[in-house]
Amino acid sequence: MELPTLSKTLKFNHVIEVVEFLNYNIITDVIMDKKAILHIEGPVSCKIANMMMKYNIDLKVSSAFGGNIKVVHAAMLSLAKTQFTIDMKYATTPLVFVDIIVDRTNAAETTANAVIHLPMVVKAEYAAVINSGLIHTSMNIFVLPTTLVARRFKGYADLNLAEKKVKAELFWDAEKDANKKLSLTTSFTVDSSMRKILIQ
């Protein structure tokens, strides 16, 4: 593809090589006036078997500005478990890491965990457990960890479906002062006729 309306000519070359069924190699080049400014290359694979699907993308991105970015993306989807991962690095320096897991292997409950990490910006961890009588969620977020204004936010919430009660706590400076917190304890009723949840 060419874009002649620009002061420079921009070309995109994209090749998909079929290695085998559901396995490919991707090569993409962006060229400006015969000079390569971006190159993307790597395998893409997918596997489907036994009510489960997996796919994996492993790309290397290089540019005229120097350095390589490694992008790894993987996912697994099944009735029992779901996982989603992104891992990006500049050379050996981490840029972005995301890992989300939902586990349904225990018939009595569902668990979920998530990690989101942007170095020097935020590292956040979330968790949840859901069963027939209780929904428990928690979080642990560390913001600007390498700076003087670093702050950790921690908290949890319990929704007791059997007793119709809610309990929650949020610490907004958990790293330095455990007394800086908000607490909530309340009960609720469900009015099915009005389709409302009433907080007491």
Range-by-range predicted roles:
Residues 1-200:
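Beta-strand-dominated lipid-handling architectures at cellular/organellar boundaries
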